[in-house]
């Protein structure tokens, strides 16, 4: 709707405005929400882009070390019991796993963009793995 210019008009001699009672004036002066200011929220794309820049800049491991170590030991139990791991071996495994996952998510994102979407879906990951020759 277009804005229109307001022009001054002469009063037509109506009733004079009545004075409000003190309690009514106090009620109107107080905000209806109780004076609680809502915390500032960024729009979702802003936060996502900030996180992307942050993690692309960083070099630290993204998966916590102890949960990853427990997972490796649990998987290794299926193949041979009483296996021992050097801490450097677990570190090397974690580096390799994270590099693989980052690369896979990059390819998955490209598949989603190719499908004219910005949200990755399981079918994008399946396509990325299939194109890599990892899954027939």
UniProtKB/Swiss-Prot annotation:
A biological-process GO annotation: DNA damage response
CDD domains: HFD_H3
Domain of life (superkingdom): Eukaryota
Chief localisation class: nucleus
The keyword ATP-binding appears for this protein: no
Keywords: Acetylation, Chromosome, DNA-binding, Methylation, Nucleosome core, Nucleus, Phosphoprotein
GO molecular function: chromatin-protein adaptor activity; DNA binding; protein heterodimerization activity; structural constituent of chromatin
UniProt xrefs under Pfam families: Histone
Segments for region (Disordered): 1-45
N6-methyllysine: residues bearing it: 5, 10, 19, 24, 28, 37, 80
N6,N6-dimethyllysine sites (modified residues): 5, 15, 28, 37, 80
Modified sites of kind N6-acetyllysine: 10, 15, 19, 24, 28, 37, 57, 65, 123
Modified residues (Phosphoserine): 11
Signal peptide feature range: none
PTM statement from Swiss-Prot or TrEMBL: Phosphorylated by ark1 to form H3S10ph in a cell cycle-dependent manner during mitosis and meiosis. H3S10ph is also formed by ssp2, promotes subsequent H3K14ac formation by gcn5, and is required for transcriptional activation through TBP recruitment to the promoters. Dephosphorylation is performed by sds21. Mono-, di- and trimethylated by the COMPASS complex to form H3K4me1/2/3. H3K4me activates gene expression by regulating transcription elongation and plays a role in telomere length maintenance. H3K4me enrichment correlates with transcription levels, and occurs in a 5' to 3' gradient with H3K4me3 enrichment at the 5'-end of genes, shifting to H3K4me2 and then H3K4me1. Methylated by clr4 to form H3K9me1. H3K9me1 represents a specific tag for epigenetic transcriptional repression by recruiting swi6/HP1 to methylated histones. Targeting to histone probably involves clr3 and rik1.
Biased segments, Low complexity type: 19-32
N6,N6,N6-trimethyllysine modified-residue sites: 5, 28, 37, 80
Keyword flag Cytoplasm: no
Cellular compartments annotated: Nucleus; Chromosome
Gene Ontology cellular component annotations, sorted alphabetically: heterochromatin; mating-type region heterochromatin; nucleosome; nucleus; pericentric heterochromatin; subtelomeric heterochromatin
Function as written in the Swiss-Prot or TrEMBL entry: Core component of nucleosome. Nucleosomes wrap and compact DNA into chromatin, limiting DNA accessibility to the cellular machineries which require DNA as a template. Histones thereby play a central role in transcription regulation, DNA repair, DNA replication and chromosomal stability. DNA accessibility is regulated via a complex set of post-translational modifications of histones, also called histone code, and nucleosome remodeling.
Subunit relationships: The nucleosome is a histone octamer containing two molecules each of H2A, H2B, H3 and H4 assembled in one H3-H4 heterotetramer and two H2A-H2B heterodimers. The octamer wraps approximately 147 bp of DNA.
Family: Belongs to the histone H3 family.
Protein name, entry field: Histone H3.3
Biological source species: Schizosaccharomyces pombe (strain 972 / ATCC 24843) (Fission yeast)
